């Protein structure tokens, strides 16, 4: 067994899903001492129909039994509530749209979980993420790379990981395609081989997002206006909407008027008719107004420049300015951009082509080829000057601290 695969104590985050199960199996086959940890990160809905935690633990325990490893149930719910969920609520309250999975990875799975694993004497941790870690021999730094399966790559969610975290982390299934992972699970008889992949935010489950958020943030109704200032209806609270949103606006039957259609034609919008769908374009917290526009290619939905804050760089220092690629949302195709400036805290990107519905609170993540450089939280993007300025001076009441 070579040095890379010399026997080590490795703690695997077993979620009950097939990816982490195959991760544990592959490491056990390599001769490592593997210990499974099931992370319980949410307990507010333990008795509800939306909580799958108990079922997931049963699945994880069954996997551990088949593979022949120990499994421990560890409760990180308090850490999750303090470090992830509280920030999630603050961001929504301020009119932004956060990505809690990114914060969960940085604060829970690769911090609290990593710390727990080290206390167990682990040399490494491993998870079922579709990403790769590579040590650059010339720089001595650990690089975060996209997973080999482009349809499953999760490096976007991992861009906040630092050198200390990456040096202790393995992503075995990042070297595989999902079809191979399913095949391995089926061949060795894993009980969750055909289990459906989890989707969405873990603590929300399958319930309607608005119903969940309304438990914590009070409704604050206000007007819905189009780009010419016409009132089209009433919203339930700005926190319950995100830029680019099309469904759930309650104005599906509203048609554009003649003057509005002419204005769209003058802007060069192609194919805009009175029955075109409406999209959320801006949330103005000063006036509690939800601004919507008609047509997917409306200029209010297009941005070529964005600024990001709270940046985190995998190498530990900001990359040099220059051409690279970026994603402003998960599953987006890499977009060519110029990194105009970058510090340890902020960066500015200029895109070769307009980006659709760039959303404050989401993350802009930078790449050079398959290498993820890091990124930051989108703070603002360039939009027409006629668009009202977003302010956070007036925010809805936070029901639960």
UniProtKB/Swiss-Prot annotation:
Belongs to the MnmA/TRMU family. NCBIfam families: PRK00143.1, trmU. This is tRNA-specific 2-thiouridylase MnmA. It comes from Polaromonas sp. (strain JS666 / ATCC BAA-500). Disulfide bonds join 104-202. It is found in: Cytoplasm. The keyword Magnesium does not apply. It catalyses: S-sulfanyl-L-cysteinyl-[protein] + uridine(34) in tRNA + AH2 + ATP = 2-thiouridine(34) in tRNA + L-cysteinyl-[protein] + A + AMP + diphosphate + H(+). Its EC number is 2.8.1.13. GO terms for molecular function: ATP binding; tRNA binding; tRNA-uridine 2-sulfurtransferase activity. Keywords: ATP-binding, Cytoplasm, Disulfide bond, Nucleotide-binding, RNA-binding, Transferase, tRNA processing, tRNA-binding.
